[in-house]
Amino acid sequence: MYKKLGVLLGFSLVTFAASAQNLHMNDLKLKADIDWLNTQGVTQISTSTWPLTANEIRRSISVATAQTQAQQQVLQSVKIRLSNNRESVVQAFGELSLQTSRQQLPQAFADNKLAGQQAMVGIALTERDWEANIQATVKNDKLIDDSSDVSFEGSYLAGNYANQWLIGGKIPTWWGPGHDGSLIRGDASIPVTGFTMQRDIQNAPTSQYLSWLGPWQYQLFAGQFDDYEAVPDAKLFGARLTASPWPWLELGASRTFMWGGEGRPESLSSFGDALLGTKDNESTNSSDSVDDPANQLGGFDAKLNLSSLINVPSNVYGQYIGEDEAGGLPAKNMYLAGVDYASSIQGKPYQLYAEYTDTRSSGDVEGISYDHFIYTDGYYQQGYPLGYALGGDAESIAIGSRVWLDNRNFINAKLQHAKVNQADEAINQAFPEEDKLTSIDVSWEHQWQPLTKVTSRVWAVDSDNRSSDIGVGASIELKTY
């Protein structure tokens, strides 16, 4: 393993880190930049559905006007990201990260350093309407055991036609308005391999009957699980739709279902039952499970931008997801709610947020959330949740802040208290036993040179059942331009 790390590290020292530029995968700094500008009323770009497209970001910032020094600083940061876009380019890239053990540290958005030692190299090819990103990662002291020595997460091939992107590969996803988590499609697990389809530019409909919807986006997903032992070759399907009928409101609806796999029906009629939600949960806890076509989740989310409504730079948002019951609305719901505020002090932009999450079943610990009586490994891949990072039957309150010290230094900090795995479900390998945690997590991103970024991180976790954990991590990334 260390020999493989050394080989990849050798390549990474003579290549450069970059990423294809038409599509932006989960990126905390980019999300924070856009969220801050949205809250300030400078831009209107949805960050509730990832990946984001460069053309959609460009559409909004092309008409954005900065009124203050802080707004100009953050807007310029996004413009620099987009100015790197070229219509035809080949890029090589590499990254090295090191960290101490982090078994108890809750994951957050774009938190993809999941090994003690991790080295990644690859190549990206970008044209105006297509792009390919091939990358290989070797990990030692892995947090998630994926039974492979070399992983290709983050690799994809994508094409754009008639304002529609089709992406095939192993890419992260994010559905929802939360800062720290999504109840239905988060990025705590290794990405599910599959196909994603979504719009490029999120213009409002031109029809006089539909123009009231405002800017809108959809995302469709179809893929297959890796290492899902309970039902090998199980499939995952999902759909999300968002719309902003007014500048101060974004609404979203999401649905996923696990279907098929070894020993399960894979007929067209069975898929139709799963797609329409018929027969779902009719045979729950019954020995006759043939009629239950899928493990389904669904729900809604909303985000209210107070800057556009009452000139206060703040957002209020919420999400609820439940078991997608046949013939009705979701039941046995999980909830997420939060508020954030964006301003500046002495010309330095900052953002504050508070977020509460409850993944119990409508407030009760029942061992139902992210679980299923057929797909008994649950709504997890390799034991890590596809939804909220803490898994089912958890409660969490998080308070966080982001500070832009200048155009080269960005700090992200979070204090979180959580009750995890209160049903004591073994399928949750992220937190395999009932516990109470209090954690503080601080990271610093430094643009050392125009082509070099260094990130450092320190955290501390206090646990009821385990000894306290204090950890540190660092990574270095190089770019071609």
What are these regions (language model features)?
Residues 194-375, 399, 411, 419-426, ...:
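Signature for the C-terminal beta-barrel architecture of outer-membrane proteins
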Residues 47, 106-112, 142-146, 183-186, ...:
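Outer-membrane beta-barrel domain signature
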Residues 12-17:
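N-terminal signal peptide c-region/cleavage motif recognized by signal peptidases
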Residues 194, 241, 446, 467-481:
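Outer-membrane beta-barrel "beta-signal"
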Residues 98-104, 127-129, 138-142, 161-163, ...:
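Transmembrane beta-strands of outer-membrane beta-barrel pores
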Residues 112-119, 147-155, 188-198, 233-237, ...:
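Residues that define the transmembrane beta-barrel architecture of outer-membrane proteins
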Residues 23, 46-50, 68-70, 80-92, ...:
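Short loop/turn motifs that connect adjacent beta-strands in outer-membrane beta-barrel proteins
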Residues 18-111:
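N-terminal periplasmic/intermembrane-space "pro-region" immediately following the signal or transit peptide
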